[in-house]
Amino acid sequence: MSDSTSSSPLNPISIVDSEYCVPDEIRFHIGRKCFDLDEYSFTVTDDSGKINWEIIMYNPLRGDNKFRVHDNEGKIIMTLQESNFEVFSRSSYAAYKGDSTEEKDFLFSVTRTWGLFWKCDLKGYLPSTKEEKGGFDFEVVAFWLNKDFVVKQKGGHVLVDGYFVGGNWIGGSSSFNVIVSSNVDYAFIVALAVMFFDSSIGSARVWKDHPDDIVSD
């Protein structure tokens, strides 16, 4: 991976599919649509109105731990599986092609570790990288007080800048904006953003023993 810190990579970075790499910078708005007993979901739109995705976890309080990413036509392009969720501790996610969680369809994984209370880190791993050897391919670094986060390659190359709008970190932000650099797989970035959002503000698993505490937007 490149060590450059410029905002646009020289070569397209395709993780999910090359069709999601475009020559122009894209601004996305990701908002929490629903959070109740039957559905935990997000909407994803861009400034041009050409992209209108839904990311849905069905029956979040009844054992489902998978977000499914639906494109404009409703096709499932990716499944995001959560495991080992622990509040203010360590959790992990894995992304797969389509409606699958099979090893042959594995795309990437992330782990979250809480260091300081006001900072959250996600380390990401591609199939060719072994986490146990101490390497990682990309990371998400976020600061609660600034309401922002950055996705970087290991060498420091910035792939995306994002910031939260509507609400606050600790109280539960309802939406955020993501600016994806040109030639960067935006499906990959959207998946990372939802993983980050879910792990940071508290997912459905946080409330599994306290359903009366859930507040829907």
Feature annotation, model-predicted:
Residues 1-65, 72-75, 90, 101-217:
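Low-complexity or membrane-interfacial segments used for flexible interactions
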Residues 96-100:
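Short edge-strand/loop segments of extracellular domains
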